[in-house]
């Protein structure tokens, strides 16, 4: 059905499963491997003989040549994109007698969750793993439901230098990587999408371990003018609808021709689409910035000119570029913020695996800095702060 008004709030409510997920996390913390084996049998209907996936090399060797080629090509593209935006190891300067700067250091141990669902998703492992490799992460661990670990997952894991693959899915996988078990290594950060149980688990463990964010259902906003190809618009919307019935799909257009054609063609579909007539492209940009979508597609004649006006979006495709290419081979990531989070953060990149360490050095700072520091420290009641500064430079 076609809707002509946007909802006030997008559905992404995992609060209804929080209590169940809390119990899972608590059980894993208490029982470790024993809990994982029991929970896998309960939820994934698999009786594990080993939590650590064996014979990765053997499984990787079974990959088909065409799939291997596709993975190699996409791996290289993602690597080159992230390497091109990787910052220098040290950035700094000086002022008023003080040398200062930042050092970029990689996170040491990362856990990547590769979701199950109807299919295995090797593209997610590429998107999460390659930026970690570029950043210099020394230990990468992967967890995925046991029935979804296939030759593609194994092959990519070898290319990434993954230390171990765990045959664990769902909230129990997140708990295991967050707190560690007899077999599963405790990591510093967990990255990767998943269902509401996985997202609830990431939310609950986020006070103890880093996470990439809370990813909700797929979102796409298309802004189209009269130059856009309506058939391509329909394909782009249907492509993102493949992610499930919870997807949030919006067309904003100032063209009656586009609006009418797309509405007619999509009306027979079971998914819900929002088709909105706007007065101008500027108005459409304003609406898109308020939505802050995961994917934004500017299918307009002057897309490059309008790109700087985009303030909030996970990823933007310009002109005739299909949004789906970012899901696979463009180089930027498909693990993107949803549900308005694009207002404050972006998609996964090399920066998600780097941390800043600030430094300062001085033997002779200008007197005004010394005096200012002492005055403010004493004002705040920190006398020894003031003395530790003053004794060195007076």
Curated annotation (Swiss-Prot):
Cofactor: how and how many bound: Binds 1 zinc ion per subunit.
Gene3D superfamilies reported for this sequence: 1.20.5.1300, Nitrogenase molybdenum iron protein domain
Binding positions for Zn(2+) per the UniProt entry: 240, 243, 327, 385
List of catalytic residues: 294-295
Keywords: Amino-acid biosynthesis, Histidine biosynthesis, Metal-binding, NAD, Oxidoreductase, Zinc
EC class (word): oxidoreductase
The protein's required cofactors: Zn(2+)
Keyword Amino-acid biosynthesis: yes
EC numbers: 1.1.1.23
Positions bound to NAD(+): 113, 172, 195
InterPro entries (alphabetical): Ald_DH/histidinol_DH, Histidinol_DH_CS, Histidinol_DH_monofunct, Hstdl_DH
MF-aspect GO terms: histidinol dehydrogenase activity; NAD binding; zinc ion binding
Swiss-Prot/TrEMBL catalytic activity: L-histidinol + 2 NAD(+) + H2O = L-histidine + 2 NADH + 3 H(+)
One GO cellular component, as annotated: cytoplasm
Binding site for substrate: 218, 240, 243, 295, 327, 380, 385
Functional pathway: Amino-acid biosynthesis; L-histidine biosynthesis; L-histidine from 5-phospho-alpha-D-ribose 1-diphosphate: step 9/9
Name used for this protein in its record: Histidinol dehydrogenase
Lineage: Archaea, Thermoproteota, Thermoprotei, Sulfolobales, Sulfolobaceae
């Amino acid at each position: 059905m076609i809707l002509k008004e946007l909802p006030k709030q997008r559905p992404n409510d995992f609060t209804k499963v929080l209590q169940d997920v809390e119990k899972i996390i608590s059980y894993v913390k208490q029982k470790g491997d024993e809990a994982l084996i029991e929970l896998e049998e309960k939820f994934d209907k698999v009786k594990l003989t080993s939590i650590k996936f064996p014979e990765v090399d053997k499984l990787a060797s079974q990959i088909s040549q065409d799939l291997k080629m596709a993975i190699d090509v996409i791996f290289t593209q993602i690597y080159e994109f992230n390497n091109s935006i990787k910052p220098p190891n040290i950035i700094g300067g000086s002022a008023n007698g003080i040398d200062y700067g930042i050092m970029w250091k990689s996170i040491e141990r990362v856990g990547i969750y590769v979701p199950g669902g109807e299919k295995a998703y090797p593209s997610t492992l590429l998107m999460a793993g390659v930026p970690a490799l570029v950043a210099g992460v020394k230990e990468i661990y992967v967890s995925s439901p046991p029935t979804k670990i296939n030759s593609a997952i194994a092959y990519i894991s070898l290319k990434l230098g993954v230390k171990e693959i765990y045959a664990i899915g769902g909230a129990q996988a997140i708990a295991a990587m967050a707190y560690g078990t007899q077999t599963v290594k405790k990591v510093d950060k967990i990255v990767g999408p998943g269902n509401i149980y996985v997202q609830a688990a990431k939310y609950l463990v986020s006070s103890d371990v880093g996470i990439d964010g809370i990813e909700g259902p797929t979102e796409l906003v298309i802004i189209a003018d009269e130059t856009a190809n309506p058939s391509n618009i329909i394909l782009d919307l249907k492509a993102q609808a493949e992610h499930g019935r919870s997807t949030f799909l919006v067309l904003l257009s100032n063209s009656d021709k586009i609006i009418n054609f797309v509405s007619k063609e999509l009306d027979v579909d079971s998914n819900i689409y929002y088709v909105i007539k706007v007065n101008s492209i500027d108005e459409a940009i304003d609406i898109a910035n308020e939505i802050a979508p995961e994917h934004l597609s500017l299918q307009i004649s002057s897309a490059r000119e309008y790109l700087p006006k985009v303030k909030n979006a996970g990823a933007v495709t310009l002109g005739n570029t299909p949004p789906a290419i970012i899901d696979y081979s463009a180089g930027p990531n498909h693990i993107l913020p949803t549900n308005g989070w694009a207002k404050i953060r972006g998609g996964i990149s090399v920066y998600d695996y780097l941390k800043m360490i600030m430094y300062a050095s001085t033997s002779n700072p200008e007197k005004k800095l010394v005096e200012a520091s002492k005055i403010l420290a004493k004002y705040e009641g920190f006398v020894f702060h003031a003395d530790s500064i003053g004794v060195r430079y007076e």
